[in-house]
Regions:
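Asp-based, Mg2+/Mn2+-dependent phosphohydrolase catalytic module
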Residues: 52, 75, 79-115
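Conserved acidic, metal-coordinating active-site core of Asp-based
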Residues: 1-75
Length: 115
């Protein structure tokens, strides 16, 4: 029985990536030398959690720092970009916190009075 693949990291250059058959799978550059293939969008998992626990949009908070987080940055959800995040993600965010390695999630939670 085949297992579903959720994420693949490929160490390659941009030139080398041109020869990789992606078969329509969504991909983003994780780092300059690493291509990330993530066939399942993260928002899908959030929708499943919302359905299971009967949550509404106002109860959803997402944190992100990379282009693979873009699908979660929906206007109806509270979106928080990490300070070290990619510029396009920061543009979509409702709040930008400190870097991930500077306790950015903690800082945002304190800022909004969640803790």
């Amino acid at each position: 029985k085949a297992e579903q693949i959720y994420k693949i990291f490929i160490a390659c250059t941009r030139k080398e990536s041109e020869e990789i058959p992606l078969h329509g799978l969504p991909s983003v550059w994780f780092r300059e030398d690493t291509l990330l293939i993530e066939p399942v969008q993260k928002e899908r998992g959030i929708f499943e959690i919302m359905k299971r626990y009967h949550l509404n949009d106002e109860q959803i908070v997402v944190f992100g720092d990379g282009m693979n987080d873009c699908s979660m940055f929906r206007k109806e959800w509270m979106t928080v970009a990490m300070g070290n995040g990619k510029a396009p993600l920061k543009e979509k965010a409702k709040y930008i916190t400190k870097n991930a390695d500077e306790d950015g999630i903690y800082e945002a939670c304190r800022h909004f009075g969640w803790i």
